[in-house]
From Swiss-Prot:
Annotated gene: ycdX
Binding-site positions, Zn(2+) 2: 15, 40, 194
HAMAP family: YcdX_phosphat
Lineage, uppermost ranks: Bacteria, Pseudomonadati, Pseudomonadota, Gammaproteobacteria, Enterobacterales
Free-text cofactor note: Binds 3 Zn(2+) ions per subunit.
Family, as annotated: Belongs to the PHP family.
Name of the featured protein: Probable phosphatase YcdX
Length: 245
């Protein structure tokens, strides 16, 4: 098991069922050292208000030896790469994930989807693109992976895509992993948990990575320090409370 999980939702996204405290308790049981709460951005119908994200600054950094990153799974809004995260939200958040979600950006043709994703990557506002292997959104995988490597943005392999959602993602995700490997980029693993019980589960992700001989040294979840080094390379100030994770 890797000790870092970068994608999960709480009851603040009302189609999810666990609290921050639930995730902390589960992290202690499973040996997770660092995790990110990434509730849906406010343009989603059941997402929290933008004040929710601004007020995450009151969260403790570490509880019972478990580090907590303040994050969001923002929505890509248009071909210009705009996302539903702005202003004071950026000041409170450590980790910005962004991806396509049908209620905000409906599936388009391959060229349009690719343009929107690359513009989001190039914006400098995001750290990870969520579930880029979603078969509903055809993209130029090679072009996206090369843009992500250039701009130091990780592409996610999402465990939920192989279990509960985005049916038919396997082939696309293998292609994404292979393209990231060839481009020398980063992969992030996300459980995409909507209940704490699936936190840290990456078994299906690892099957995808193994199938393409993906290099472990390019997986962000291998250690808290690797993930923090990545975020600091993107401009995040070092967080003193995480020094001993």
């Amino acid at each position: 098991m890797y000790p870092v999980d970068l994608h999960m939702h709480t009851v603040a996204s009302t189609h999810a069922y666990s609290t921050l405290s639930d995730y902390i308790a589960q992290a202690k049981q499973k040996g997770i050292k660092l995790f990110a709460i990434t509730d849906h951005g406010p343009d989603m119908e059941d997402a929290p208000h933008h004040w929710h994200f601004i007020n995450m600054r009151i969260w403790p950094r570490v509880v019972d030896g478990v580090g907590i990153l303040r994050g969001i799974e923002a929505n890509i809004k248009n071909v210009d790469g705009e996302i539903d995260c702005s202003g004071k939200m950026f000041d409170s958040l450590d980790l910005i994930i962004a991806g396509f979600h049908e209620p905000v950006f409906a599936p388009h043709d391959k060229a349009t989807n690719t343009q929107a994703m690359i513009a989001t990557i190039a914006s400098g506002n995001v750290h990870i693109i969520s579930h880029p292997g979603n078969p509903k959104y055809e993209i130029d995988v090679k072009a996206v992976a090369e843009a992500a490597a250039k701009h130091q943005v990780a592409l996610e392999i999402n465990n939920s895509s192989f279990l509960h959602s985005r049916k038919g993602s396997e082939d696309n995700c293998r292609a994404v992993a292979a393209a990231v490997r060839d481009a020398g980029g980063w992969v992030a693993l996300g459980s995409d948990s909507h209940t704490a019980f699936t936190m840290g589960e990456f078994e299906e992700c690892l099957k995808i990575l193994d199938a393409v001989d993906f290099p472990p040294e390019r997986i962000l979840n291998v250690s808290p320090r690797r993930l923090l080094n990545f975020l600091e390379s993107r401009g995040m100030a070092p967080i003193a409370e995480f020094a001993d994770l």
